[in-house]
Amino acid sequence: MGALPEPAEDVLRRALVSEFTVLGPSGRPITHPMIPLYDGERIYLHSSILFSKKLAHIKANPKVSLAITDLGATHGEPLTHRVTVQGDAAVIEDDPHTTWQRILPLWIEKEPIVKEFYAKRVALPLFWERSLIEITPRRVLIWPEGSTERPPVVHELTGVA
């Protein structure tokens, strides 16, 4: 088991889409559909460096939320739980050409077609200039069996660096 409760880890490993929420300059939440990638400790997202206001929003306020609510958005069996992870995000942009590549194996595992696109990356060079978003989970809410008719099971995470 990694840093998160097992049901949350299962959802993060299998979900193809999540709702990633940042706070805009006015303090209002702004939500983006994103592919969640999980390495057993941190949650990773990635974003093009072009036209990405979400990166500026994270730098201004690192408090974020990642919700996975679409039980059918997987390659295999439907998800059995809905999950929201609240935490702190950091934008890692040391080198937009290579820094994000450390999550490439996770991305390919989730979306095998990415391997084919990556092989043809010279055709879309600006698409592959990416920033890495690293989320340190602080709190996890789990709705067992996906039912929102009951309150979620809440896990406050301690000892997560």
Report each predicted region and the residues it spans.
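Charged, gly/pro-rich active-site loop segments
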Residues: E77-A161
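Short acidic (Asp/Glu) patches
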Residues: S48-S52, A67-G72, K110-R121
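Short, surface-exposed beta-strand-loop junctions and turns on beta-sheet-rich folds
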Residues: F51-K53, E149-R150
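Short, basic/aromatic recognition patches
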Residues: M1-E19
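Active-site-adjacent structural patch at catalytic or cofactor/ligand-binding sites
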Residues: N61-L71, H81-A90
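Short beta-strand segments
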Residues: A15-L50, A56, L66-D70, E77-T80
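Structured helix-beta-strand junction loops
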Residues: R14-A15, A60-N61, R138
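Amphipathic alpha-helical interface surfaces
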Residues: A8, K54, T99-I103
